[in-house]
Amino acid sequence: MAISATQVKDLREKTGAGIMDCKRALEDAGGDVNQAIAILKQQGLSKAEKKSGRAATDGLVEPYIHAGGRIGALVEVNCETDFVGRTSEFRTLAHDVAMQVAASSPKYVSEDQIPEDAWDGLIQEYGDRAKAIQAVCLLDQVFIKDGRRTIRDLVNDNIGKVGENIVVRRFARFELGADLPPAADEVTE
């Protein structure tokens, strides 16, 4: 089946993938755009797996201050080169991750950062291990802008687009007065 330039352009706009990748995916899918998107997503995941071992030492620290200035977040997102770190796609990813941190209050970047002695309390609070991971691990949280994807999916999609490893290294979340004891007049009996 002959794939038109319009089909390739449309798929590219939807996925951000390269021209030849879009053309190959459309050819493999017999012109079916939805199947081509699935193929590109799978390729993106395999690219992410291949690149995960590469050092990501460049990148940026992205701030996000929620309207009203009462909640804010800082995230460090790393990539392999300063070229990628300056792209609008990378900056958008970092901004979205910072917004996620401000909105969802994760405690850890990923499951491997959870201390062993914290598991009992987390399982008691959330009911089971999987729910606890989704609640407290940034990469496993459902993306606030798209409830069908996690932050890990968002990062992996960007790895596939830019062709470099991307790592969410760390974050800090600030909420005005969150760590202060209640004032004497706020204490109820």
Feature locations, PLM:
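N-terminal assembly/interaction segments in proteins that build large macromolecular machines
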Residues: A2-E189
